[in-house]
Amino acid sequence: MRCFKATIAYDGAYFLGYAKQPNKLGVQDKIENALNTLGIKSVVVAAGRTDKGVHANNQVLSFHAPKHWNVAKLFYYLAPKLAPHIVLKKLEEKNFHARFDAQKRAYRYLLTKNLKTPFLAPYIACGDYGSLDLLNSALKQFTGKHDFSLFKKEGGATTNPNRIIFNAFAYTAFIMGHECVVFKIIGDAFLRSSVRLIIQTCVQYSLEKITLAEIEMQIHNIKATIRTPIMADGLYLHRVYY
């Protein structure tokens, strides 16, 4: 068997998350079904398991295929089976594990105060976000190693809630005809819905609805103030570092 590394982009609006679903509407379902039609039966491992509605610019996968499949041949037959909502950007033969070998994962979140068209609603979140300076003041609180037990969706199981945030910041950009604030958060890994809870917390602070002290108490597992994540629209798994 050969091990392949695939880099894909997908539109999360058409899936119920990356992981396999009972109704077969996960990204993993679509890819494994496509491979099955080619006679390839393999579990497809992803660098990050995105939630329902979350997109990916550069999700990385690993899977195995029989030796008679080379890169060019597999790309030729697989890419059309994934289109249009999944794009196979790159395929290479590489002996690695997409999840366990990943060192960092970067997420981006796009938020605008005024969405001009409903057709972009799944791709740019809409809502007030207050001040850029206040957003960055809040984001700084999350850098470093922390126990993120109070920054994960209830029911999200994990054996180790400790994660490292290497960098977290926000900036403004003009994207798809909209003035947006762009959040970028880079960490070693993330708990379920953790990125969205972090961003929601920062937005609520920027809108002066919570204090830095309350953020610190939640980071230190003293008291949870924000338990509802921000909407999934506008969140992208942007890059995986190896």
Curated annotation (Swiss-Prot):
Record EC number: 5.4.99.12
CDD domains found in the cross-reference section: PseudoU_synth_EcTruA (cd02570)
SUPFAM superfamilies: Pseudouridine synthase
Residues at the active site: D51
Family stated for the protein in its record: Belongs to the tRNA pseudouridine synthase TruA family.
Residues holding substrate: Y107
Superkingdom field: Bacteria
Its job: Formation of pseudouridine at positions 38, 39 and 40 in the anticodon stem and loop of transfer RNAs.
Keyword Membrane among UniProt keywords: no
MF term (GO), any: tRNA pseudouridine(38-40) synthase activity
Catalytically driven reaction(s): uridine(38/39/40) in tRNA = pseudouridine(38/39/40) in tRNA
InterPro entries listed in its UniProt record: PsdUridine_synth_cat_dom_sf, PsdUridine_synth_TruA, PsdUridine_synth_TruA_a/b_dom, PsdUridine_synth_TruA_C, TruA/RsuA/RluB/E/F_N
Keywords: Isomerase, tRNA processing
Name of the gene this protein is made from: truA
Gene Ontology annotations of biological process type: tRNA pseudouridine synthesis
Pfam families: PseudoU_synth_1 (PF01416)
Source organism per UniProt: Helicobacter pylori (strain HPAG1)
Name the record gives this protein: tRNA pseudouridine synthase A
Assembly description: Homodimer.
The keyword tRNA processing appears for this protein: yes
